[in-house]
């Protein structure tokens, strides 16, 4: 397995991966999400590759106060082999190198498997409520 920074040629393969991982939602256009990421800290957008095939991804961010992680996904055929742990670990190292004191991760409430994985990596449920407001409405995907 190789973990590397996303490249423009990975575009379609990553979107297909996200489809396999059930990460896509109608209100989020994945092409726009990638384009936005490529314009802001693209070196925090990581992919895991096996024999030239992308099998995992994580899209990280850092605003100078907190880090974030989105689109963590591992192809179903490759789950349980440590790919997600490796992606998060690499992202954590990149964030620490930037002086990031804390990484916040949003997970859907019903995603018990992913919550369990993060708990094994010493992440804890926080007593906060996340609020959001859509500022730009993407075209439905």
Swiss-Prot record:
Keywords: Acyltransferase, Transferase. The keyword Transmembrane does not apply. It is an enzyme of class 2 (transferase). Belongs to the acetyltransferase family. YpeA subfamily. It comes from Yersinia pestis. SUPFAM superfamilies: Acyl-CoA N-acyltransferases (Nat) (SSF55729). Its EC number is 2.3.1.-. This is Uncharacterized N-acetyltransferase YPO3031/y1452/YP_2654. GO terms for molecular function: acyltransferase activity, transferring groups other than amino-acyl groups. Residues 1-141 form the N-acetyltransferase domain. The keyword Lipid biosynthesis does not apply. Pfam families: Acetyltransf_1.
